[in-house]
Amino acid sequence: MGTWLRSARARLGDWGGALASILLPAPCQVCGELLDSSQRIPICARCLAQFQPLAGPLCERCGRPILSAFAAEISPLLCHMCHRGLYDFDFARSYAEYGPVASRAVLMLKYEQVLPLGAWFAHKLAAAIAQSPADFAADVVVPVPLHAARHRERGYNQAELIARPLARMLGLPFRSALLVRIKPRPDKLKLTIRERWRTVRGAYATRQGAQVDKLRVLLVDDVFTTGATLDACSRALRKAGAVRVAGLTVARVLPPSYSRPDARIVPQGDRPTGSGA
């Protein structure tokens, strides 16, 4: 009898799954509300509606939100990190803040194999690019790579699941093999800011034989935490000859100080000349 049931369930395939979702509707993975049976993403419409673009003003280079009464009077508008020339990439943006909905959605894609989220995120990023296409001008789309051991363990690279459909939407070549991670990430779950920078230093390289010279690269990842990963990838790409690197992530982790005015904006007259990166 058990064999017959398994066989019947296999024959039913998607129909069986749809029937089960009607009889036993799944809860939203953020708020617990019961989902509509047609939803491929296990997050309700109300929670998805909270996934909103970061509000400006933003740092003109890295996209960090800047809360300051003087922001409108400063040009160019740079955060203290970009004023110091910390980042190697030319431009970066994140779609949303890494809040409750964004963090849960990213983790579901990353660890729970909710793969439709990759294309859903890609649509959001494509909309962000449409707001400023010149800043994202690129020849190729490249996902931030996982180390080979981590890729084998997880079975996929979440950045690739976002970058591939995004490249298709933009009509650009997708180059998943252009960058490789040559140093593994420590097993420690949470890293300090200093540890994040140290562990990615020299962790990426272009694949041997890859054609990178004079390329404009759109680099895609899931989360911008400190910017260390995008910076390390950008340095590897530039070393191989890339002329421009723009970074794009689904979400950005904002520091606790985000709730207070950013007192570290530097007036234009006090800014150094050159990129400093």
Pin down the residues of each PLM region:
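A short coil-to-beta-strand element that immediately follows conserved catalytic motifs
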Residues: 38, 140, 170-180
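Extended interfacial segments that mediate partner engagement and assembly in macromolecular machines
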Residues: 49-169, 189, 193
